[in-house]
Amino acid sequence: GGCIFCSAGGSGDFAASPQQSVTGQIAQAKLLLREKTNCRKYIAYFQAYTNTYAPVGVLRALYTEALAQPDIVALSIATRCDCLPPDVLDLLAELNTIKPVWVELGLQTIHEHTLRFIRSGFSLAQYKQAVSALHARGIKVITHLILGLPGETTDDMRASVRYLAAHPVFGVKLQLLHVLEGTDLGTLYKNDPFPLFTLEEYCDLIADCLALLPPEMVIHRLTGDGPRRLLLAPQWSTDKKRVLNTIHRQLAGRDLWQGKYYRNEEFHG
């Protein structure tokens, strides 16, 4: 059961302790952020697991507790595209009139054979339906794509990016495939290692992806963080500054920028 690449933390390996109240978790996260940055405003991110999978009354209490804090300026809710029933959509639309509400959907790929392999449990059609329902209610969508899934070529990955570019998506998180200890993907990798991106290959692909996306689309993530204690591969991904610097060099060296090849079918990578 569950997706093939998810750790026991349900993609929330860096989140505050879920045993605390929402207010307590936000306070803990603020302390951590203040050590690194000088930020004064925050986005409340409901990240781990499926954050719309509860009775609507429970969800209302959790979301409004977060939104009630004056320095919380937006709510970002990560969930599955098949866990957005009408009553939850109506709640999100209502809260969106108070402060901006974003919904994050983990599509990962548009290719059905890969969706089956990673055990996503939903289809591309269900994702499209969820985006339409959210868009109709004025709720912004952030879509996650994973680059480097086994069995996919770079052309397959660029096709997923082109698909997002053609749909009403506010933002995107481009995520390098991390192979983690304690996941089914990790077991597969240890038994029969499959090819993973080198730093240069990944940054080359990211430059392509940025060129294909609309200039107004918000890029929320370019690589992602795998928890060091669980990360089997690729180890180069732990040096985030080096990754970002390499992406900048690729863009400059190839004279690329976000949107350069948007709607230009002459570009095929």
Question: Which residues make up each language-model segment?
Answer:
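Short microdomains enriched in Cys/His and/or Lys/Arg
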Residues: 20-35, 235
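Conserved SAM/AdoMet-binding glycine-rich loop
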Residues: 36-122, 126-130, 135-136
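Auxiliary Fe-S-binding modules of radical SAM enzymes
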Residues: 171, 179-269
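Alpha-helix N-cap and loop-to-helix initiation/capping positions
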Residues: 21, 54, 58, 118-126, ...
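Short amphipathic alpha-helices and their capping/turn segments at secondary-structure boundaries
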Residues: 29-33, 84-98, 129, 158-168, ...
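Short, small-residue-enriched loops and turns at beta-alpha junctions
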Residues: 50-54, 81-84, 148-152, 180, ...
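Conserved C-terminal portion of the radical SAM core fold
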Residues: 125-184, 200-225
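Canonical Radical SAM [4Fe-4S] cluster-binding loop centered on the CxxxCxxC motif
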Residues: 1-21
